[in-house]
Amino acid sequence: MEISLIGWIHTILGTLAIIVAVFIISTQGFINSKNNFGKFYIIATVITASTALLMYKNGGFNLAHILAILTIVAIILGITSEKYNILGISKYIQAMSYTGSVLFHLIPGIAEVNKRLPIDNPMGLSVLDPVNIRYYLIFTAIIGTTILIQWYFLWKKRSMS
């Protein structure tokens, strides 16, 4: 399967965004827009989600487009929660939104990688292939656990102050 220029931009930025997100979460605990890594993640994520909305090779509007919209909504929610303290839970919303957006990146990425690799015998030929479903569940559990850990540390920090 050949990849278009917009597909390459989408793939490269999306991959870099995921790598940067993992780096941020593992070194700083949370993604935020106040440092350069966080800014890069947010900008790359919005560009990746926006370019996803321009791709229709797989038969029109589909799950990947819905996830792109959810990604943009999550980023907007994360940015908004950084700027405004909503009922004292803005930090929790920020953590959930930004970290959740990583999952929205991963789901279509998993399907695309498994559709293409290995080249001679791809693992998952459709979005709903059992191999892909297993990966979705694994990464949903990892991201969900990460969000719960982030919330725990926010709660602990808040209760100590």
Residue ranges and their predicted role:
Residues 1-161:
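Alpha-helical membrane insertion/targeting regions
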